[in-house]
Amino acid sequence: MMGDSHSSFTTTTDEHLYNQFSPGRRKNDFPAASSSSSSPNLRRSPNRTVSSPRVQQKPITIFDQIVDWFQAEISVRKRLAGAACGYLSTIFFIVTVSILKLTIWAPFSSVQDSLAWWIYPNAWASIIFVGIASVAMSLFSIIKFCKVDQLPRLAATDTFALAGVALEFVTRLTFVYTAFCVADFSFSREFAFVAISLAIAISSALVVFRSDYQLNFSHIQVNSVKTLIDFGTSLPYANISEICGIDAAISYTAAVALILVVGPMVSGFSAWWLLLNIPFHVVLFGLCFTQQFYSKISMKIVNQIVMKPISFPFPPPYTVHSPTPEQTRTLPNVIETDDSLLKFFALHDLRTIAWNDEKRRVDVFSLSQPGKHPRNWKAVSLPCVRMLDELCSRMTVSAARLVGYSWDDHDIENEDVPRDALLMPRKMREMAYRGTGQSRQQKSMAPIRSHNTQTVGLLSKISNFLGFGVTEKLVISRFDAHMNAYAAEALYMLVVDSMGEDRFGVVQKDLKDLITLLCKLIAAIDTYERAKASVADKSDVTFLRIVDASLKSSLQRVVTTFGSHLSSLNLPEEHSRTIRMICLTDEL
């Protein structure tokens, strides 16, 4: 995880300042032996012996307590999301049965029956049964699949994914069969139900393997009736319906093909009469479409409940000798934890502070008492700087490997090349010391070890899709891209806000370093994208554009805010050139 390692690319002075100003880290700097040796759990007693004197219990830090509290909170939210999805599935069940009860042969009585059937107690057992089964299936999907660092698609070889397909199929088949029985529908007793079962099986596989289970924050947070209405109206129903229609058409086509090919062998040629049964086609396509639509809407509900933002306070300017568990859950402590989901919440909260919360920004720009140190600013800025600096270094190293300047190429160098010439550029060195012998010519013509996958065949693509192929490790994942985007937007928006709100100048002291890091990272991403242009797999380039957009918008805001004052920073010419190129300004 980026930002978790303390041996990152920041200077020793910054690390020392961070350890000095972070109260949570200061508590954890003592050796483990001193705390464990004084613990009563490790003292010898007449009734208890210690098996090994070298075994010491790891002390529980405030970071462990924060993570335990957060995991308990997320567990409660996931159960609540599962119950909400089960409630939504119950509503879908009631609507499905009501539609199945409609018939043109008895319009008035069927309409009355479809509207009031669920009120009678004899129908409650089926409704409760479907609701419980839906809650169980939703909880399994949320716990096993819904993660903040989840891939866009699950691999076909994933055991839990295959189990999820089986559970989704059983749950949905139970849903459909119960609806047919309650509505007294004829398709539950013929070969039609076999075709419907096949369509549901394929639709279940599409639900699991083509759904995006990544946990992410919603743009609209539901906390009132008005925000609930806004959230409902903001959903892209046209896009969702198009995707659901395509997946439903795949399942529908498979069921029709089954009737054409297998139907005569199982039920005789009478099975072909289903092809002329219009209600059968409507029900078949409608069941597949509602299954896909329910899966998309339920994921929106899960993100709305599980990913509800948490507001973390800042520590007071004075030292608290015996803080309560609530007082230890401060933003500087939370942003330093190892839990990826908790750090994601912390960076989102920091971004919210930088953009919308003027009252809490006062704490960021405040000084500690006594001492008057910018403790809060250092505590929230250094993790963001480490994260962005690590990404910059990875971009630089990966770009060098793509163009062939890596340590793997040293084994093809000629042994007769002088040692001093190794500092020369590669092409210049080859031109100066290329020999006429066949061995030297073969070595100079050796291919560069790059990861060019442009000639990947059809079988390789199929194996990669099914999860059997060996895929290249991405330089940055989608989760890391969102993390770095949040860090950049929070950090540099605080720089912009400091122009009018930083009374003590705690941010202006780091302004040159922050702008330098911003320009270096933009240049590193641009170099990597150019080196990646000839490679077929551009997944990480797509994710990098998320970070690149945040960095460029941040640079434009900083330059617009400070304007001509940036000339006093004496930035290097390459960084000034980057600023002029992106911001289209001549002030530097």
Swiss-Prot record:
Effect of disrupting the coding gene: Embryonic lethality ranges from 40% to 100%. One-cell stage embryos show shorter lengths with decreased pronuclei diameter resulting in decreased embryo nuclear size. Nascent nuclear envelopes in the non-core regions are more continuous and contain fewer holes that may contain nascent nuclear pore complexes following initiation of furrow ingression. Two- and four-cell stage embryos contain half the normal density of nuclear pore complexes.
One Gene Ontology term from the biological process aspect of the record: mRNA transport
Family matches, as InterPro entries: Nucleoporin_prot_Ndc1/Nup
Region of interest called Disordered, as start-end residue ranges on this chain: 1-55
Disulphide bridges: none
Biased composition (Polar residues): 1-12
Membrane-side (Cytoplasmic) residue stretches: 1-79, 144-159, 212-255, 299-588
GO MF annotations in UniProt: protein-macromolecule adaptor activity
Transmembrane helix is among the record's keywords: yes
Compartment list: Nucleus, Nuclear pore complex; Nucleus membrane
Positions of transmembrane segments: 80-100, 123-143, 160-180, 191-211, 256-276, 278-298
Keyword line: Membrane, mRNA transport, Nuclear pore complex, Nucleus, Protein transport, Translocation, Transmembrane, Transmembrane helix, Transport
Membrane topology: Multi-pass membrane protein
Functional summary from the UniProt entry: Component of the nuclear pore complex (NPC), which plays a key role in de novo assembly and insertion of NPC in the nuclear envelope. Plays a role in postmitotic nuclear pore complex assembly potentially by promoting localization of nuclear pore complex proteins to the nuclear rim.
Family the UniProt entry places it in: Belongs to the NDC1 family.
Name the UniProt record assigns to this protein: Nucleoporin ndc-1
Organism: Caenorhabditis elegans
Designated gene of the protein: npp-22
